[in-house]
């Protein structure tokens, strides 16, 4: 779907020119707006869903990491520090829910990040805890400074961010500076892994650089950027089969890639996401990151774009390994449209915007083609392996399901949000509302929201008894922001961004502001 060929229903919609807000799109593309009462009612409904999930978590699971929303039990999969609370903070701030915000701030002040009985993931802890606290700090010290009256409670967020960084930084103490991911913070040990993944290594720089910029201690930025340097200049050269597209695993001892398997799927995904986001964060310091993203984006369009045989109008991203394309993808991968749209708007590149919209449309198809209206965990368009039971689905939808699970992932709604912000086209908000409504209809329990075992079965199959913390951080936030008023943290056209979202949807203030 390209900007020049969007076809939208105009029923009950007003049409205005987007040229003022989105000058790079030109005046030929109308911005369509729903009735303001409808927009407000949808924003209120999403806030109510957030509060429903929070109330259940608070009653049955707090201060543990996550609620088990079927049994009303709890889990501690993220170190036992209250992941859902910290992950919910920035969304609660944006929704201006002072009661929840203060509950979370009180909790953060009590966390001892030096103590846990579980293995700690550097990656997950960075994006959820460190990102959540830094975002809360930036929002409450900035555009939402009137929400919390006691400034000392806000200051604790930065203090605790530094405490967490100090606990985690031994992960980078390796011969190369490429960190271990799985840590024993009590002993200062690790799992002895020989390699680390592309996304795990390449999704640290934003949070750790922000921590340095706020504290004035360059240690954190230096550590994360040293690790990133091996990804920006990949060795051996064979690890970069196409310009900007690199392998999936890095040797911890010497920083060299151990393969040349390329994808935007889970395990690789957020490395590419952060390249352009670091440029948004500070274009002066991170011009090389932008150059690498542009190279990767152009190579992706040329070498990885794939069209199902029964639906050549759709675009998915294949993977690549030693001359062979893998024709399968994941819900996780559907962040890709948003990445192209962010890069396209920031760099004024219509080709990236158009390709991003193609990817968004393809991911929408995975939602629009199931019985629940929710997309599957993974899918394929490889005609050599279509199950007979899904032949009709492939004929109609251009894909078949390889895992029908849904664990409250946000990536499709996330890319719908970027499409809405990049184009102003009302269609994308309608897609957000449809996706949110499906989650609300099929995943809601008496105490929260559960995962589903099969999005293409009646009632979503059976339920997973787990509510991931990213429901609060991402699904609720991206859904809400599409119907909320414009604000400093919303994605803006061109170079107008005051905030940039980490991969857990926590907005951090860009360096120049």
Swiss-Prot record:
It is an enzyme of class 3 (hydrolase). GO terms for biological process: carbohydrate metabolic process; ERAD pathway; protein glycosylation. GO terms for cellular component: cytoplasmic vesicle lumen; endoplasmic reticulum; membrane. Its main location: cytoplasm. Gene3D superfamilies: 1.50.10.10. It comes from the Eukaryota. InterPro entries: 6hp_glycosidase-like_sf, Glyco_hydro_47, Glycosyl_Hydrolase_47, Seven-hairpin_glycosidases. Residues 1-21 form the signal peptide. Glycans are attached at residues 97, 117, 184, 251, 322, 348, 368. GO terms for molecular function: calcium ion binding; mannosyl-oligosaccharide 1,2-alpha-mannosidase activity. Involved in the maturation of Asn-linked oligosaccharides. Progressively trims alpha-1,2-linked mannose residues from Man(9)GlcNAc(2) to produce Man(5)GlcNAc(2). This is Probable mannosyl-oligosaccharide alpha-1,2-mannosidase 1B. The lineage of its organism: Eukaryota, Fungi, Dikarya, Ascomycota, Pezizomycotina.
